[in-house]
Curated annotation (Swiss-Prot):
PANTHER family the record matches: LARGE RIBOSOMAL SUBUNIT PROTEIN BL27M, RIBOSOMAL PROTEIN L27
Keyword tRNA-binding attributed: no
Gene Ontology CC annotation, any one: mitochondrial inner membrane
Protein name: Large ribosomal subunit protein bL27m
Length: 148
């Protein structure tokens, strides 16, 4: 009889270990909503700022015409070309637009340009694009005294 009681107790202990408790059967999950995350990439659908060249090579321009708009220096002002406060290039005189690639030697007072030049390899030459306006009328004409 003692053996039967021991077997019955171990069987009920094993069943109690394997079967889930009754309290878990009564637990109910209610509807819930997760909190929304924040979006990081706002403003990606804004239109472009329309930077770029306004007058191409060979175009005739009047004084004050905008030649190019830029955010950073992509084109540098050359002869008869002014630089606006927002880095736009404009014509100072009437004439024809010309673009050239020239060797760029920055002034020693410009620390950013000096840092760039010091990082270049030995013997490297720095070229930049310059915008010029060739005046339509000659600036100064002179005659030799012998021709008078």
């Amino acid at each position: 009889m003692a053996l039967a009681v021991l077997a019955w107790r171990t069987r009920t202990a094993v069943i109690a270990l394997l079967s889930p408790p009754q309290a878990a059967a009564l637990a109910v999950r209610y509807a819930s909503k997760k909190t929304g995350g924040s979006s990081k990439n706002l403003g990606g659908k804004s239109p472009g700022k329309r930077f770029g060249i306004r007058k191409m090579e060979g175009h005739y321009v009047h004084a004050g015409n905008i030649l190019a708009t830029q955010r950073h220096f992509r084109w540098h002002p050359g002869a008869h070309v002014g630089l606006g406060k927002n880095k736009c290039l404009y014509a100072l005189e009437e004439g024809v637009v010309r673009y050239t690639k020239e060797v760029y030697v920055p002034s020693p007072s410009n620390s950013e340009a000096v840092d760039l030049v010091t990082r270049l390899p030995e013997g490297a030459v720095l070229y930049k694009t310059f915008v010029h306006v060739v005046p339509a009328k000659p600036e100064g004409t002179f005659k030799l005294v012998a021709m008078l």
